[in-house]
Structure formats: C-alpha cells, structure tokens
Amino acid sequence: SSRRIAAFSLIGAGMDKDFYVNGADAQRSAYTTYLTSLLTLSGLGADEAAQRVAAFYDAEAAISAASLDPQDYSNVDKTYNLFTLGELKTLLPNVDLNAVLAASGIENAERIMVSDVGALKAAAALYDDAHLALLKTAARLALLQSVATSLNQGFMDAYFDFVLGYYGVDARQSNEQIAAQQVQALLADYLSRAYVDEYFSAKAKADVEEMIGEFIAIYKERILAQDWMSAETKAKAVKKLDTMGVKVGYPDSWESCLDRAEIKSPAEGGSFFSNVIAIQMAMKQDVLAHQNDAPDKSEWIMTPFTVNACYNPSANDITFPAAILQSPLYDVNASREENLGGIGYIIAHEITHAFDNNGAKFDENGSAADWWTAED
C-alpha cells in the first residue's frame, strides 16, 4: 500500500469460466454473433470474420480452463502475485516486455503484479508465429469492444442484440439515455461536483462523519470484549479501526485530469469519438504521471453520484457517496433514530468488511498481511 506497481495480463477470456463449459447454446450464439458483427462492421467479410471468431473462441475457452475459479478472484492469497521483471520475462519468453512497458509509458517496473497466473501461462503459449493471426484478431476485438458504444449505430445495435440474446433483456435506449450514460462515464468528475452542489451539503457530510465515528467506537468496544481473541490480535484490530479512512459525500479536492483533455467541437475538427479518445488519453496520462508517487489515499474510487458504499481493503477506508446519503436511507433533517435505522446499518455493514474473509487479510495500512495469531 506504500507504492504503486504495474499489473500485467495478456489476452484473456471475455466471459466467465462456467460459460465455456455449461453455457446455453443460445448464449454462446449471442456472444459469437456479437464478436462476428464487430469484425464485419470493421471491414472484414462475413466468412473470414466467422472463421476468426471460431478460432478466437477456442483460444478463450482454453485460457478460461486454466484461469482461477470465479470465487477465487476475491481471495488475495490467489490474486496477489508479484513478479520481478526478470521472473516475468522467463514466464513469457516470446513477449518483449521491455518494448511493451516502454510503449505503455511504464517506468521502473521492478515488481509487477499478475492476478491470474494460470490464465497468463495459458495465454503465453499462444504468443508465437503460428498464432499471429489469432493474436491480431484478439487485439482487434479488444479494441472494438472497448469503443463499440462510442461508434456508429451499427455497433450500438450489435451490442444491444447481444444483450437481448444473452440476457433475454431488451436494453435498447433512447439517445437521451445513451447521452446521460456517456456523460456519467466520461465526465464523472464534472457531474459529481454538479450533483453535490445540488443535492448534498457540508452539514450532512459532518453529520454522517459523526455517526461513523460512533459506530467505530462501538466496534472497538465489542472487539475488546471478545473472549476468543488474543490481546495481540485485539490491539491490531483496534489499530485498524483507529486508522480507517472515512470518505463521506464528496472528495476534499475537485482537481480533475479532465481539465487537461483536448476536447474539440465539430467546427474545430472534433467528433464524439475523437473526444472520447481524448478523455481516455487524459486519464491514462494522469495515471502515468503519478506512477512513481506514493498512493494518494485521499483519492476516491467511487463517484459521489453513485448509489452505493464500499470498504476498500487496500486503503483501509470506507466510502459513502452523496447519492446514497439521500432519503429514505438518510435525511439531514430526519431524527437520529431514523437515520440510524437507514444508513446506520449500511455503515455497520461496510465497517464489518474490514474483518471479513478478504478484509481480514489486510492490515491498518492497506497492505496484504497476516496480522492474526495462529490461534485466532
């Protein structure tokens, strides 16, 4: 938790592990039809696109078979795998890691994290001349899937056809709904400030912070009262509560990398797609600019307009965005009892995550560490 490190992966499976083994024929058809549509919409002939997707699907299935089971992705013991650059080069003999890191703008990659080693090894076996066409297909599909909803109506229709075929839900939206979603996704920093100005107050922020402090105090009392925990483990648990970060409503700073995005109007030669790319580039450059800095634990991983809350084990903090601090869960003008019965149970729930089967594997600084005694 004291430094930022790079994470690395190769091509992977686009769907969950069970899909490739037990998925219904209709769902598989919806998925492969979608991939084929992406390739034909980008200029390939129908027959060539179908052949490429068939080979790609088989590769995905092989990688999926070697990957972690779904429940293991929340197990830090299985996903926190650090490699030196030399170790990773040995694992990936056909990948020029130095060139990849340089092209990505990553510097000083002394340690690199791999979340799914099995999937990486299976994918690495495909990185040779014999699979060059497959790798080109994978790269093309990865790019198209990442931008499909920012392209023309044909790509949008292909996506909604996939959702209908896979989930049985017609998710087609009006242009207004699509525009609202794009604003939320691309201009989240600006929308967050506008939302807070309209729907949240400093008074509410202070009130909820006080409530959280009361809950943390009660947790400490109850931990100290347990007869099954050793004094050593109790002390560390209390320390984790004492250092737990509390984020309520909105961040203290509204600085945004969006300020540096080169947005151009149609009159200036810009388009919706070019502006999407400009925003994504600004976000990427912001990440790269801070890659050698210590993690900024004041940064938020949720937007203030998100109706949710979370505990982040790698920062040891809890976050309650302004949007969840609304009626009926919370009202600054309601009684304390009403608010305790609403947002109170969510506060208690999020604090508990610090000691669940995943959170308990991180210490007060957010570092993966076994701080429990063997007996406890």
Where is each model-derived feature located?
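Intrinsically disordered, low-complexity linker/terminal regions across diverse proteins
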Residues: 91-94, 106, 113, 117, ...
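Noncatalytic, helix-rich "gating/capping" subdomain that lines the substrate-entry/channel surface
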Residues: 1-214
